[in-house]
Amino acid sequence: MSQLDLGTQSLELERFPPQENSNTLQAWEAADEYLLQNIDLSQIDGRPVLVFNDQFGTLACALHAYRPFSSSDSYMSQLATAHNLRLNHLDESAVTLLSSVDDLPEAPKLVVIKIPKALALLEHQLRALRRVVAPDTVIIAGAKSRDVHNSTLQLFEKILGPTKTTLAWKKARLIHCEVADIPLADAPETIDWPLPNTDYIIHNHANVFSRNNLDIGARFFMEILPYDVTGKIADLGCGNGVVGLIALEQNPLAEMLFVDESYMAVASSELNITVNRPQDLSRCEFMVSHGLAGVERESLQLVLCNPPFHQQHAVSDHVAWQMFCDAKRCLKAGGELMIVGNRHLDYFHKLKRLFGNCETLDSNQKFMVLKSVKQASSRSEGGGSGSLDMSYSDF
């Protein structure tokens, strides 16, 4: 937990999900401070205030008195925003949480943007803004200086209007943009490409990992996916759903759950099944969730996972660890977790400690595919759909 002093208010902010041994990672950054110092609150006239990509809810908490709309592709960021509003005893209902696929409010007076990691997501958001902004909408964006490039400024200028940047402050930089009536060619909502060695066409929304081609880890994983599994299979952290798509084809008696914390990932997965295997839609469920938090314990036969080892710009295997613990809770006795991961992450020993067993199914110079089986003697993980009661530090 860290404290952000804004002069007129002080906020206690925490990263989400809460992590042990995370004292070096705070829930806000200099760009948040810089943005809040440079917003002229006197300009807010009762029209909507709109915030984008507020990772842990810092901006929403600071601007809660103006009842902001907060748009994000990340369900985890939405949970973090709600968590930090509660932590500061602020009214959760004062902030309207929007997903990246929701419509934006018309004619906002103030738009505050944290520059996202993916330039394609920024372009999507700026194009969505163009459809709703008014001539007097105030637009201000911020990021670490290293993340504000000429291409970033050019996007603002091409889509919205004249753009200028500030001097750096604490290694952060701001962007000010004016709305202008400029011509702009249409752009498709998704991009598509053929999936190698299949007849499938993959469609990706803006914020999907490895948007322009097949992720090399997924490619390696897909080569050894099992056949003829019965019961329910989860593609955990599904991205665009390519792993689940192949699993769906190879396991005609199974049901498939696609789950991710990215709204655009889940939307892409659903689109890819609809386009490529419409006959199998009745066997599929699509869920935006924090891991398997919404899934009943001991309900899955197989969990497939290509876990992330970053949370935005921070390197961390905490999210992957939560996925593994969730998988153990949700697997039936005898059910299997199969993962693909970079060799240097040492998932083998973590899974062996958690499940009591781990097998290397395949490996190359960069990746390993591992399998763990849930034993019938595994200790009870509790009921309902909560997380496994086990600390990361235990391992």
Curated annotation (Swiss-Prot):
Recorded family membership: Belongs to the methyltransferase superfamily. RlmG family.
One term under GO cellular component: cytoplasm
Reaction catalysis annotation: guanosine(1835) in 23S rRNA + S-adenosyl-L-methionine = N(2)-methylguanosine(1835) in 23S rRNA + S-adenosyl-L-homocysteine + H(+)
Nucleus in keyword set: no
Any one GO molecular function term: nucleic acid binding
EC number from the UniProt entry: 2.1.1.174
Superkingdom of the source species: Bacteria
Organism encoding this protein: Yersinia pestis
Role according to the record: Specifically methylates the guanine in position 1835 (m2G1835) of 23S rRNA.
One of the GO biological process terms: rRNA base methylation
Pfam families cross-referenced by the UniProt entry: MTS
Keywords annotated in UniProt: Cytoplasm, Methyltransferase, rRNA processing, S-adenosyl-L-methionine, Transferase
Protein name: Ribosomal RNA large subunit methyltransferase G
Protein location: Cytoplasm
